[in-house]
Amino acid sequence: MIPPGARAVIWLLCTYPETREADERVQAAARLQRTLGLPIWLFGSRSAQYPTPVEQTLRNKLVAAGVPADAVACSIELTTAVTLDTSQEAVNVAATARARGIDALVCVSNRLHLLQARALLRRSGLRLILAPTPLRDRRWWYVTVRLVLIPLAMLGLGHRFPPLVLLRRARARLASWPV
């Protein structure tokens, strides 16, 4: 799993914290933290959909699942970079890992999300250990978007995909979702 002598962290990827799938990811990350003794990093997306930051909601769930609070680090504690989507999250996680001497990431999410993250980080030099959880979000648009973003990420275009850039800019300006 993790190479001997490697410095590793658990990276919990999650954008929608109030779902059954998110709860399963939190439980998986908590089990891994107890088993491996590694810290958990949260680089949750900023979303106007939730009144509190996504990563803070996830931290609260992890602590409720028995993870020590000091074993969970939110992106605001690790970097000043903004994270609005998986592409930015991957860039920020890789930069933070390099700056902190981390060699390996144990990545927790559903398989589609993990494939995208792996594609985005394929040239980062980081060892990725994938810890997939079940895909519960089977909305047609979610699956379709992930299936489009995976090959774009493999081509190195994920962060420059025009619809994603426009969405990212719109999300950055919203204090709350339009009613």
Residue ranges of predicted features:
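A structural signal for short, hydrophobic/glycine-enriched beta-strand patches
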Residues: 1-145
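Active-site cores that bind ATP or allylic diphosphates and position pyrophosphate for catalysis
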Residues: 168-179
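A transmembrane-helix-recognition feature enriched in membrane-embedded lipid enzymes
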Residues: 140-170
